[in-house]
């Protein structure tokens, strides 16, 4: 019986017992009964209580740093005694765990490097991603890059396959599309071979009138406007119309000359568009108003709409000064004008019922609104 009681009181000597196991770190010897009182042992044969194994608690913990065994982990905060130096994690089963997908973390902190995930190279991306060009644009690129500005059908195929690896997967589909675009698009002209030029097949070249449709790798289906292609003609026509309409007025002639593109670009063309300018102006005004409101919200006038009649209508625009918690209401409330002389007419009897109107306002936010301020009740009237 004596041996059973000594074993029942064994939790007070739990430190030396756990140190003898050789599995847990020495921080477990600081485990105190005041935080987690151990249960009584059911039988004398049970020598190692499982309630002190922190592996059961840490196994279900969602803390991801237990998987990295980072040097930045300190001892648990609920362990008694002075905090020791930074050491390894107190989870025994995680010491020798194999981590095939996690590489060594950086020296600055925890975190594993996913060595199995590799970013594709530029060549792989070009094979996977379809080029953002139409078949007409591809043909125009090939012909425009040739020294003599003409290519055969096989040379166009070769150019597309060499510069865009995406089309190497299935050649039948895109080659058929290129043949259709060559035959159906009027911008591509067939040129016969010379007699002294050996080979098979005709050359394909670009129509000189369609070369302006090729802009920055994008081949337009529609031609440019005459105003875009011939800016000088449009400007000269504008000057002639200005002279005919404003004949005899030097002011209109000076305006036409100053705005003509031949004399040089106007300042408005280099600046933002009118829509953008209006938008920026409006936004700057809104921003300035919001800054004023944030700086002193109580100093702005507050308008209160109340059912007050004619001559007895008080000033509805009241200015408030800034509020500080250390001052009282009488110190920071702004002075109000004296009440005007009251009339005994029954039309002003509504001014006497100022209590329900003022009850909906909080005195902390609107301290200047009182029965002696904006609303002037009749003398001798019971509220």
UniProtKB/Swiss-Prot annotation:
Residues 130-224 bind DNA. GO terms for cellular component: nucleus. Residues 1-55, 215-277, 317-348 are annotated as: Disordered. InterPro entries: Fork_head_dom, FOX_domain-containing, TF_fork_head_CS_1, TF_fork_head_CS_2, WH-like_DNA-bd_sf, WH_DNA-bd_sf. Pfam families: Forkhead. The keyword rRNA processing does not apply. This is Forkhead box protein I3-B. The lineage of its organism: Eukaryota, Metazoa, Chordata, Craniata, Vertebrata. The gene is foxi3b.
């Amino acid at each position: 019986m004596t041996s059973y009681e000594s074993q029942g009181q064994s939790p007070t000597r739990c430190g030396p017992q756990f140190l003898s196991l050789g599995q847990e770190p020495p921080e477990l010897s600081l485990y105190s009964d005041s935080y987690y009182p151990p249960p009584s042992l059911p039988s004398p044969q049970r020598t190692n209580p499982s309630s002190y194994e922190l592996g059961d608690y840490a196994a279900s913990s969602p803390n991801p740093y237990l998987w990295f065994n980072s040097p930045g982990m300190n001892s648990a905060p609920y362990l008694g005694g002075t905090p020791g130096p930074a050491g390894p994690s107190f989870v025994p089963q995680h010491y020798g765990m194999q981590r095939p997908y996690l590489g060594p973390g950086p020296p600055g902190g925890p975190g594993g490097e996913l060595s199995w995930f590799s970013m594709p190279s530029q060549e792989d991306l070009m094979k996977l991603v379809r080029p953002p060009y139409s078949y007409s644009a591809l043909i125009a690129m090939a012909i425009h890059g040739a020294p003599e500005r003409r290519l055969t059908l096989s040379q166009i195929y070769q150019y597309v396959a060499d510069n865009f690896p995406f089309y190497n997967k299935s050649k039948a589909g895109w080659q058929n599309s290129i043949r259709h675009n060559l035959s159906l698009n009027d911008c591509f002209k067939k040129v016969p071979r010379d007699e002294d030029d050996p080979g098979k097949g005709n050359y394909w070249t670009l129509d000189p009138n369609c070369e302006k449709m090729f802009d920055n790798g994008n081949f337009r289906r529609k031609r440019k406007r005459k105003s875009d292609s011939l800016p000088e003609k449009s400007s000269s026509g504008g000057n002639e119309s200005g002279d005919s309409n404003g004949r005899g007025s030097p002011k209109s002639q000076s305006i036409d000359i100053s705005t003509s593109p031949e004399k040089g670009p106007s300042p408005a063309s280099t600046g933002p568009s009118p829509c953008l300018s209006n938008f920026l102006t409006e936004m700057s005004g809104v921003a300035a108003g919001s800054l004023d409101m944030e700086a002193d919200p109580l100093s702005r006038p507050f308008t209160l709409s109340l059912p007050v009649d004619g001559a007895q209508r008080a000033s509805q625009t009241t200015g408030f000064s800034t509020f500080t918690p250390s001052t009282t209401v009488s110190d920071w409330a702004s002075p109000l004008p004296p009440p005007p002389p009251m009339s005994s007419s029954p039309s002003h009897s509504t001014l006497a019922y100022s209590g329900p109107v003022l009850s909906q306002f909080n005195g902390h936010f609107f301290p200047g609104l009182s029965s002696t301020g904006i609303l002037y009740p009749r003398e001798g009237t019971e509220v």
